[in-house]
Amino acid sequence: YEVGAAMAPYSSVSRLFRRHPSIRWSRPYHSMIDDSVRTLLDAEPQWRIADCSEPAILHDGYRPELLAGSDKADRLRQAMEADLQERPGDPYASAKLGGLLISEGKNEDAIPLLENGLKQCGSAGAERYELLLHLGLALTPSDPDKAVNCYRQALEIPLDTRVSLGARLNLAARLMDQGNL
């Protein structure tokens, strides 16, 4: 659970794991172990992934008072821009940088970045959900109907209900604005 997070209070992250020499951190800035776990499961299929039904970690690094005056946004921007230089259109980096741009009010910069990330993203999964959620947020001021479509597509992805809370709440808000709820 992301205490104080403005956009999505729940995230599904792989942070609790059994010690194994093949599991390592990857990706810039928002480190994760998912890539190495996929490789490990291919090589050693006897391993199983456990899913916590309740939030296992309370993270408070996104509270506004903690972010104010920090260089967290600059570090995120630099890491994601460098990653996109190496892998243009990478869905993970596009989603993270797109979210940052939206939080800074740069929706017009975020939209093409997120659309490009979606073109290179598979048909399911957390990255696609995050791209669609952020694209919906970016489109809301200029094209609320298109934003509604993004939220609906995001909700078609089979994710834990808590993880999809952002799309659910934003879809409900847009439908209320349109008088359709």
Show which residues each predicted segment covers.
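Alpha-helical junction/boundary sensor with strong preference for TPR arrays
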Residues: 2, 87, 121, 157-158
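Structural motif corresponding to the intra-repeat A-B loop/turn of tetratricopeptide repeats
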Residues: 104, 141-142, 178
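Catalytic-site signature of metal-activated, phosphate-bearing donor transferases
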Residues: 1-105, 109-112
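Start-of-helix register in tetratricopeptide repeats
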Residues: 92, 126-130, 163-166
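Alpha-helical positions within canonical tetratricopeptide repeat
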Residues: 109, 146-149
